[in-house]
Amino acid sequence: MLFRNSLVFSVPLWIALKALKWHLLLNSYWKESSFSLALNSFLCGFSFGLITPGKVGELSRVLYLPFENRGDGIGLIILDRYCDLIALLFLAVFGVTHFAGFLYGFLVFLSGAIAASLFFLFPHLLELLCRQNKFASISNYMNHLRKIPPINSDVFFRVLVISFSCFVVSVATSFSLLLSFGDAPLSTALTVFPLTLLTNVLPITIGNLGVREGATIYLLGQYGLEKEVAFHVSILLFVLHSVIPALLGSIIQPFTRAGRKVKDSQLDRKATNI
């Protein structure tokens, strides 16, 4: 019963953390953004992301924002996913060290540190690229990025912490699922599940089906666990933290009025000009 309650609770907790992270990013650019707006935008975009390789469909989050310049939100989505990658790299250090050795674990840690530092170097790199780029189309895109107000370091670190927390919830949920099939040491969760989550960044299949299950079966097999158990744990986590949020997003899509609000504001402006 305890395992069942923790698994059920993990779904709204995971969704709330994801929406809170998105709200922090939105509020850093559009101060009038609310948590409910961020929640609706995240869930609707997530439902499209699930059916596209590499979750590219999550860029559709901006379609559910009631702002005329909502296209600027694409940069925020990229930053959101970038923070996820950094958090995963740090979380995967223990597993990489366990399976591949200290040197590879250190390289993964170093990669995470470099990726985090690039956030602070990005404005300077952008200025350099804008001055030296000879391709007009790319230069125009770079100039467009320069117009977007930079995210301050406080927001970046808070988003990074929430990203890390989301993955901790996923790892804890996976471990709870594993315990429902039998006993397993905590070290199993700390070494295996961050690595299986890291496969989500590979844009190979829709929903990453097959890749994640294969990685879970192989890694848990190193601890002598049966393939059937590993497969069921992977599929159940996919249902809890992917299918259910995507279904919720699909349900609320018809009731999302963001696009209509944008159109209404444009019509009001035209009427005022007339």
What annotation goes with each model-predicted range?
Residues 64-71, 192, 214-229:
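Interfacial segments of multi-pass membrane proteins
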Residues 39-67:
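Extended non-transmembrane interhelical loops and adjacent amphipathic helices
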Residues 17-18, 52, 56, 87-95, ...:
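Membrane-embedded alpha-helical core segments of multi-pass
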Residues 35-37, 69-82, 226-236:
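Membrane-interface alpha-helices at helix entry/exit sites of multi-pass transporters
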Residues 1-43, 97-201, 233-235, 239-274:
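Predominantly cytoplasmic-facing regulatory/coupling regions of multi-pass membrane proteins
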Residues 78-100:
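Hydrophobic alpha-helical transmembrane segments of ABC transporter permease domains
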Residues 47-53, 194-213:
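Transmembrane alpha-helix interface/packing and boundary motifs in multi-pass membrane proteins
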